Amino acid sequence: MSQTKQTFSTELGGRPLTIEIGQLAKQANGAALIRYGETAVLATVVASKQPKDLDFFPLTVNYEEKLYAAGKIPGGFLKREGRPGENAILTSRLIDRPIRPLFPDGFRHDIQVATTVLSSDEDNSPEVAAMIGASIALSISDIPFDGPIAGVTIGRVNGEFIINPTMSQASESDIDLQVAGTKHAVNMVEAGAKEVSEQAMLEAILLGHDVIKELIAFQEEIVAAVGQEKFAYTVASFDETLVNRLKAEALAEVTTAVQVEEKQARDLAINEVISKYIDQYAADDSITEAQLAEVSGVLNKFVKTEVRRLITEDKVRPDGRGLAEIRPLDSEIGLLPRAHGSGLFTRGQTQVLSVATLGVAGDAQIIDGLGLKAEKRFMHHYNFPPFSVGEARPMRAPGRREIGHGALGERALLPVLPSETDFPYTIRLVSEVLESNGSSSQASICGSILAMMDAGVPLKAPVAGIAMGLIKEGENYSILTDIQGMEDHLGDMDFKVAGTKDGVTALQMDMKIGGITRQILEEALEQARLGRLHILEHMNSVIAEPRVELSKYAPKIVTLKINPDKIRDVIGPGGKVINGIIDETGVKIDIDQDGTVFIASTDQDGINHARQLIEDIVREVVIGEEFDGTVRRVEKFGAFVELFKGKDALVHISELALERVGQTEDVVKLGDKLKVRVTEVDDKGRVNASHKVLLVEGMSPEDRAAYDEKKKTERDSRPPRRDTGSRPPRDGQRPPRRN
């Protein structure tokens, strides 16, 4: 790589995109600094010197968000970045998926792609910059790579498509589409949408590819200027003599084995063929040790070629289904009595138990990344234990795959959730994969819908998901509906589509080949739509509408609106007031900055009591209002009467009785009930009230006339005030102040 900084510029979505090469990370095989607006991402790639002895391609992609990029200091005791967050993991996957198919078959050098966000504004996507940066770093390096690739985000506001929408535009968009590909074809799609038609999604994908082609032409100029020659590499290959012998002796048995319909029986049949020929060739003196080590690999290659041949030529799938046929469906709800909602969805040998839990606003997840701090009130977590595929492996924390599948389900379900105003609950869904033979992520979407409907969540519409596959040999191809594990593993495409009967809510496409054409995309989307409608019909037969009542174990939530200026009164100094209410009533209370108060509990009486306490605290006292109060304090000058919890009024001694009162205790004592009327509220909120005015109004006309006459006589009999005249002038100067 050149050691002198070189700069290349273009525009993306009407904003400047600048690539700087040759200044940073010069010991990496390839490095580039991408500036997009005020967003800056460093992309580096490194390859091991020697290939690894592995049967897979060891590619690692990392996307790192440094909080200094947004002018933030990490929280916690250590004050440094910890494990990558969910967004970083999902972005790593977004970069990995389009570049992985473009490395040579059999390439076994360790490859590490690292993209680091160094600066981030709120409008220019660091994810897009990182994907472009990874492609440029690979393309200019000496690492064999059949790129470049590029990626863009497509949104749609008021029917108009937008390239790389800003944050404000994204909030109004009904499509959130990330698309990546080469100059020839699209090879990665990730999308969320608000029940958008298949045709609109196709148009968005194709628009994205048009932009991608422009970005790739820009990258090719960079490669021509600073690109390195690719290093030579060796690809492991099987012994040709062994391949030919096994083809003659074992291919027919492999063909029979791959057509066993049941998954475990099919796996057993394939393993028996492999074991048979390993044992047979181990006893054959003409077979070398090196050839014997390759027997399993050759036979597994035959498994792949035969499955693909049967599908593309004979239109026969391993389990005997037609290309567009969906496996048998079975569903059940309400399996777990103490859970708020549960749904079991089974499709063939894939089975998912989804469980819905309803929580309060305080249960929302706090998201504090490079962007603005936000709360997430809907979560979908996906778990894939080893027993689901009949394996004994360590039970570990969720990996990238589980996090990715959980996020896909979340994206698919989000558009049909009720608004927070209509349903002020935090919703957590957990999908437990109990059996897996492909399409478990889509089964988790179906199971989650069943669980939420069982929980009484008022969904706008049910959603179903289906996974499509592709087997392509030259110009000959077959699109598969509801792929099973073997078809996913040996096929060329995994295309997941989720949506309602009216439109798509999520898409995810991964390719193992260079890309696919518009025709294949169109056919796959239409085939997926028909499959989705079939699954929705089945789900509707199990539960057609969400339950009217929530589970008795779910919290009930009541909301009320208070003046935001009164929030501090409800909270109190150090939280004293609100904690007192919580302790007294046993409820949970959350308050938004706009004055919305959420009160939650399984006990309705506790909710009602807490609501009354809060309403009393924020209540505005009006002159003329009457209260049946309680005497809480007695002073020489009058009594303090509690009108309601948290609000007292002073009843002056002259306002306690009709006659003159010598001592306050002569009329009232602590704890006495006293009816009063508010006569004054000062600018500090202090209240004066009168009991006497109510006594006067309660008199009969005769008594009132006599009382008024008596008061008049008393006033007339008082001696006149002494007239002291005006104050005389001061003589001389005022004495100085005392120190």
From Swiss-Prot:
Keyword Protein transport on entry: no
One GO term of the biological process aspect: RNA processing
InterPro entries according to UniProt: ExoRNase_PH_dom1 (IPR001247), ExoRNase_PH_dom2 (IPR015847), ExoRNase_PH_dom2_sf (IPR036345), KH_dom (IPR004087), KH_dom_type_1 (IPR004088), KH_dom_type_1_sf (IPR036612), NA-bd_OB-fold (IPR012340), PNPase (IPR012162)
Primary location: cytoplasm
Keywords (A to Z) from UniProt: Cytoplasm, Magnesium, Metal-binding, Nucleotidyltransferase, RNA-binding, Transferase
Alphabetized PROSITE patterns for the sequence: KH_TYPE_1, S1
Region annotation Disordered: where it falls in the sequence: 698-739
Catalytic activity: RNA(n+1) + phosphate = RNA(n) + a ribonucleoside 5'-diphosphate
Binding site for Mg(2+): 488, 494
Residue stretches making up the KH domain: 555-614
Domain S1 motif span(s) in chain numbering: 624-692
Compartments reported by the entry: Cytoplasm
Obligatory cofactor(s): Mg(2+)
SUPFAM superfamilies recorded: Eukaryotic type KH-domain (KH-domain type I) (SSF54791), Nucleic acid-binding proteins (SSF50249), Ribonuclease PH domain 2-like (SSF55666), Ribosomal protein S5 domain 2-like (SSF54211)
Residue spans of biased composition, Basic and acidic residues class: 701-739
E.C. numbers: 2.7.7.8
Root EC class: transferase
Any one GO CC term of the record: cytosol
Domain of life per record: Bacteria
Repeat found in the keyword field: no
GO MF annotation terms: 3'-5'-RNA exonuclease activity; magnesium ion binding; polyribonucleotide nucleotidyltransferase activity; RNA binding
Protein family (similarity comment): Belongs to the polyribonucleotide nucleotidyltransferase family.
Role, per record: Involved in mRNA degradation. Catalyzes the phosphorolysis of single-stranded polyribonucleotides processively in the 3'- to 5'-direction.
Official protein name in the record: Polyribonucleotide nucleotidyltransferase
Source organism per UniProt: Exiguobacterium sibiricum (strain DSM 17290 / CCUG 55495 / CIP 109462 / JCM 13490 / 255-15)
